[in-house]
């Protein structure tokens, strides 16, 4: 089994995190932390499943981490936040209806840009697998040896 970490979404999202919670979760399988090449996967929670509403239940109880252990996959769990003001998001949903902008469903959408930047900060460049190493509450990329 691996380890669960938090990362600062605002710091790693390239300024596109206004509708996101401060922290995201990252699950790192033991094999990935010990140097085996690993891939990355993004798991988006549903409405009312953001961390402020359910703690880490979505992250720890869906079975995704067991699948990640078996397949050498680092899992990024980005987190939204509830908002009762504009942009209105009272159930902490990902933007699937346009509450952030009309670009919500394409790569120019703010949430897509934020998650893409987070993944780049953890993951790889050019599609090549890398090793992942956890260092405190930050994720540090270490190159293949």
Regions found by a protein language model. Name each.
Residues 5, 42, 76-78:
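Hydrophobic/aromatic beta-strand patches that form the interior of the parallel beta-sheet core
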